[in-house]
């Protein structure tokens, strides 16, 4: 087997970078098995199989770019999370959402965290009950709130005093009173990028703890007949590897959680995952054990739940591309251009995120050649993998892959340069099913009414 279970041992130290490319000593080695989906293996010819499906055959059948998700991997991560938090888990759908994904996590017993009316409608279109949804967002519109309230949404996570005003106005107009959580910003620094740190003092999310806004929001919600205050919510950031960061936040929140003695306490998500050679992260189980221990130490007696997203979906998928050009610039670098790019994975452009790359036709091959994998967009920064490693015989026409693209790739995709967004397939037991089709030119023009 090429694949392994998700995660490795917890990292000892952390850097401010979320990801980094592998060191020169590691670059020539085969792609690390722990970065591949759970069921990944090589067939007799050395070609990558996922879910029993030959990925080169998938590229021929569905075209490239193509997201390939290992359904067994997704379900295994869901089950690990549910066991670690005693069945109290909401999947953070911003990581990756389509109707098939919503159905899958619902089948595994999870509720679903949605942050916009669009995410809400996709989950409902998958026949997920409104009571199994948690409505997030720092700027929910009146229309979004009203739809969720009239449907009977499970929880609304309140993010501002303006939102409290909206809830009270909607209930006064006849909407049913919702059950709410108050999102508190603990104001701590975490080891991640500024763009994904959500619990720092300077953040658009939540009620600040330090200035008394959090206490004021709790008091107002508790006194309001327009809502039922169920608990407190916190989220410190994304791609966080350090268990100490979570423990620090829980220690800061212990007094206010204890003072209010509410039944629910949600720790959010944010657990980091490895993207490149040499990175390590806690497993979901290890993370949960640390959360429970920190809650005990902070005197938090409420029922604890979590909202993982990246740790469920990221390593479950790879993206397949086809090589279109290879441009060697003597003394500078070799550019390998593919038929996708920043429109299907904007994370390298947004965050400087590192990724690996490999050839599925030779998944266990050494990778002695250094290249920079770039997309087809009109941006010099459209780089998917900088100084990546590939086999020496890479050629135009090859199918090339990047692993760990199951979270914040498809969900953050765009039509930049009017590129069509790629399809998504789920694979299991030797069968591939199309769950998101490739966009067409008709789709591209459908909203262009000028």
How would you label these PLM feature ranges?
Residues 1-179, 223-229, 430-450:
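A charged N-terminal "starter" segment
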Residues 88-90, 109-111, 130-134, 155, ...:
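Structural preference for beta-strand elements that scaffold enzyme active sites
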Residues 54, 58, 70-73, 77, ...:
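General structural feature for long, well-ordered alpha-helical segments within catalytic domains
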Residues 62, 78, 82-85, 109, ...:
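Structural signal for hydrophobic packing residues in well-ordered secondary-structure cores
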Residues 3, 301-450:
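Charged (often Lys/Glu-rich) extended helix/loop segments that serve as interaction or gating elements
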Residues 2-7, 11-30, 187-327, 390, ...:
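Active-site loop/helix belt of alpha/beta enzymes
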Residues 73, 94-98, 115-119, 138-140, ...:
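Active-site beta-loop-alpha junctions enriched in small/polar residues
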Residues 102, 125, 145-150, 167-170, ...:
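Short acidic, glycine/serine/threonine-rich loops at helix termini
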């Amino acid at each position: 087997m090429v694949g392994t279970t998700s995660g490795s041992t917890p990292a000892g130290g952390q850097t401010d970078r979320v990801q980094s490319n592998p060191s020169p000593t590691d670059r020539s080695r085969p792609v690390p098995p722990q970065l591949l989906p759970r069921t990944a293996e090589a067939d007799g010819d050395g070609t990558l199989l996922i879910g029993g499906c030959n990925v080169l055959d998938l590229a021929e059948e569905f075209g490239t770019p193509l997201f390939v998700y290992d359904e067994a991997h997704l379900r295994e991560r869901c089950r690990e999370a549910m066991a670690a938090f005693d069945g109290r888990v909401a999947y953070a759908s911003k990581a990756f959402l389509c109707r098939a994904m919503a159905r899958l996590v619902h089948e595994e017993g999870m509720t679903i965290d949605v942050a916009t009316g669009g995410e809400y409608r996709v989950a409902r279109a998958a026949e997920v009950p409104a009571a199994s949804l948690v409505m997030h967002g720092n700027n929910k519109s009146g229309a979004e709130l009203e739809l969720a309230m009239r449907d009977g949404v499970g929880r609304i996570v309140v993010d501002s005093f303006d939102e409290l005003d909206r809830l009270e106005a909607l209930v006064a107009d006849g909407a049913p009173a919702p059950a709410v959580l108050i999102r508190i910003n603990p104001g701590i620094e975490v080891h991640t990028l500024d763009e994904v740190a959500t619990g720092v003092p300077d953040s658009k999310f939540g009620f600040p703890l330090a200035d008394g806004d959090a206490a004021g929001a709790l008091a107002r919600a508790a006194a309001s007949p327009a809502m039922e205050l169920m608990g407190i919510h916190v989220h410190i950031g994304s791609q966080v590897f350090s268990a100490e960061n979570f423990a620090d936040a829980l220690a800061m929140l212990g007094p206010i959680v204890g003072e209010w003695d509410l039944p629910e306490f949600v720790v959010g998500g944010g657990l980091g995952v490895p993207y490149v050679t040499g990175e390590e992260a806690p497993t979901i189980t290890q993370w949960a054990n640390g959360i429970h221990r920190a809650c005990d130490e902070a005197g938090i007696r409420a029922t604890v739940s979590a909202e993982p997203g990246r740790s469920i979906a990221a390593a479950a998928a790879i993206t397949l591309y086809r090589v279109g050009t290879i441009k060697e610039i003597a003394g500078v670098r070799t550019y390998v251009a593919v038929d996708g790019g920043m429109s299907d994975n904007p994370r390298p452009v947004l965050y400087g995120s590192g990724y690996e790359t490999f050839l599925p036709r030779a998944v266990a091959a050494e990778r002695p050649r250094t290249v920079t994998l770039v997309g087809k967009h009109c941006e010099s920064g459209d780089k998917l993998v900088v100084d990546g490693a590939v086999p020496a015989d890479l050629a135009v026409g090859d199918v090339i892959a990047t692993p760990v693209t199951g979270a914040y790739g498809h969900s953050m995709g765009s039509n930049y340069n009017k590129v069509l967004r790629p399809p998504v397939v789920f694979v299991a037991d030797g069968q591939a099913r199309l769950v998101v089709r490739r966009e067409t030119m008709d789709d591209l023009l459908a909203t262009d009414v000028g």
